[in-house]
Amino acid sequence: MGRSISVSFGLLVVFLSLSGTGADQDCLPGWSFYEGHCYKVFNVKKTWEDAEKFCQKQSNGKHLATIEWLGKANFVAELVTLMKLETHVWIGLRVEDKRQQCSSHWTDGSAVSYENVVHNTKCFGLDQKTGYRTWVALRCELAYHFICMSRVPRGA
């Protein structure tokens, strides 16, 4: 009986250590799972456009991260904070029309249903000064770190 409890406890420790790493949700190594998607913050700086292209090249279905509700915003903020970056971080939102209005869609095509915008400019990133919890308008041609997101493959 004592040995059975010891083995069960050992398996529980292994399971808990893998939670959040993506290992138990079929995310690639280094990616983190949340609500059906995998996320990764890249410790390299790129312009908004180059960051989006980089995300797309990682695999089909990958884009700069979309933030569609507060729970996801908090998850992404914590993930970015763990990287201990000292700069803004690109997300997948940018102005796409001449009236300087926000696009109604994220880079992955999903509708914008949650907004946390401070100012209206062309590209948006997470503001380091607020612990990555608010969006800040940034010049698209500046290079910042970025966070990519992908759907977990169906049937995985």
Curated annotation (Swiss-Prot):
Expressed by the venom gland. Disulfide bonds join C27-C38, C55-C148, C123-C140. Keywords: Disulfide bond, Hemostasis impairing toxin, Secreted, Signal, Toxin. SMART domains: CLECT. Residues 34-149 form the C-type lectin domain. InterPro entries: C-type_lectin-like (IPR001304), C-type_lectin-like/link_sf (IPR016186), CTDL_fold (IPR016187), Snaclec (IPR050976). Residues 1-23 form the signal peptide. GO terms for cellular component: extracellular region. One of its GO terms (molecular function) is toxin activity. It is found in: Secreted. Shows greater sequence similarity to the alpha than beta subunits compared to other heterodimer snaclecs. Heterodimer; disulfide-linked. Belongs to the snaclec family. Interferes with one step of hemostasis (modulation of platelet aggregation, or coagulation cascade, for example). This is Snaclec A12. It comes from Macrovipera lebetinus.
